[in-house]
């Protein structure tokens, strides 16, 4: 076998066998630029083919600022309105996409992306192009099993059945299985909840420290609660765990403990800011930037402020800007 191909030699390829999306398909796009006619986007599942969301298809409601609806660099779920295979024109709509559509598309895209990342790695390792491996293995699996990831999951247990009659070497099969197993390993979720805690009474700083300390003490073997200072009276409760519901439950429990404790002091009070969120991508980066100058608060920490810093993340921004291929 020759040297593995470089990334530029892989001949990157669309996720699916069909060359264009079809009318009424839900697809994931990345916004590249916004002009008078609309937003120009890259269609991620179709090798960054260009499409356009017309201004009239951005929202059902009137809007003054386009940036409140769509931003350059963001990922968006859109509906395919028209496809001109000859000219390569693809018209898209954001306003016709329902919240259920977004969830459905994000789940499908996440599965397809795992498959595509595996294909890229295996193709590079075995001196193949992405399209070659897609044609030999992945696209037939989509056709037969509905989604290639479901088939590859089954292949980790029954490889002879799934890969039967496929024209690939045992080495390629092993690489596909080992790579997909790694991608199927559950990843820890990071959750955060923002709170304000203050005490204008005599105990002041000590009261706040004691309340936050009590909140951290609810940590157990499954969930560790960390509390970070943003700028008094703003704090963020952060935890990582595999079980989203358990993580949210523990953050809520910590909030209650902190609230109950601080209210024992004269002048002490507590307020939750927004909902508990799963964070990742840009949200996590913004949070890290905020906390860069602060360590976790303990009973010995200084109660100090560098000004009213805020993480400016919008709780109603639901699009997840996933990183491109690993």
From Swiss-Prot:
Which residue ranges are recorded for the region named Disordered?
A: 291-326
Which segments show compositional bias classed as Acidic residues?
298-326
PTM remark: Phosphorylates at Ser-59 in mature trophozoites, schizonts and gametocytes but not in rings and young trophozoites. Phosphorylates at Ser-59 by eIK2 in salivary gland sporozoites but not in midgut and hemocoel sporozoites. Dephosphorylated at Ser-59 by UIS2. Phosphorylation of eIF2alpha subunit of the pre-initiation complex eIF2 inhibits recycling of inactive eIF2-GDP to active eIF2-GTP by limiting the activity of the guanine nucleotide exchange factor eIF2B and thus, inhibits protein translation.
- What are the protein's UniProt keywords? Cytoplasm, Initiation factor, Phosphoprotein, Protein biosynthesis, RNA-binding, Translation regulation
**GO term, biological process aspect, one:** regulation of translation
Result of changing residue 59 to A: Abolishes phosphorylation. Lethal at the blood stage
The protein in question is named Eukaryotic translation initiation factor 2 subunit 1
Source species, please? Plasmodium berghei (strain Anka)
Name of the encoding gene: eIF2alpha
């Amino acid at each position: 076998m020759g040297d593995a191909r470089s990334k530029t030699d892989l001949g990157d390829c669309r996720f699916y066998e069909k060359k264009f999306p079809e009318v009424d398909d839900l697809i994931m796009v990345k916004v590249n630029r916004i002009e008078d006619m609309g937003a120009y986007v890259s269609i991620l599942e179709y090798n960054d083919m260009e499409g356009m969301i017309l201004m009239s298809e951005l929202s059902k409601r009137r809007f003054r600022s386009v940036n409140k609806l769509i931003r350059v660099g963001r990922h968006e779920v859109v509906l395919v309105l028209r496809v001109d295979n000859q000219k390569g024109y693809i018209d898209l709509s954001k306003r016709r996409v329902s919240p259920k559509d977004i969830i459905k598309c994000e789940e499908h895209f996440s599965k397809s992306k795992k498959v595509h990342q595996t294909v890229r790695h295996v193709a590079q390792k075995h001196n193949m192009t992405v399209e070659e491996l897609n044609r030999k293995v992945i696209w037939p699996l989509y056709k037969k099993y509905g989604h290639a990831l479901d088939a590859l999951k089954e292949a980790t247990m029954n490889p002879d059945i799934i890969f039967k009659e496929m024209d690939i070497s045992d080495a390629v099969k092993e690489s596909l299985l080992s790579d997909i197993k790694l991608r199927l390993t559950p990843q820890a979720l990071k959750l955060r909840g923002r709170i304000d805690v203050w005490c204008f009474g005599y105990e002041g700083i000590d009261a706040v420290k004691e309340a936050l300390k009590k909140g951290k003490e609810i940590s157990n073997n499954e969930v560790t609660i960390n509390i970070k200072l943003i700028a008094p009276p703003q704090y963020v409760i952060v935890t990582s765990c595999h079980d989203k519901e358990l993580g949210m439950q523990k953050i809520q429990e910590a909030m209650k403990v902190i609230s109950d404790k601080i209210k024992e002091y004269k002048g002490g009070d507590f307020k939750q800011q927004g909902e508990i969120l799963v964070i990742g991508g840009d949200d996590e980066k913004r949070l890290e930037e905020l906390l860069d100058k602060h360590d976790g608060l303990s009973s010995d920490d200084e109660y100090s402020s560098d000004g009213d810093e805020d993480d400016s993340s919008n709780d109603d921004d639901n699009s997840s800007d996933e990183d491109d291929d690993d």
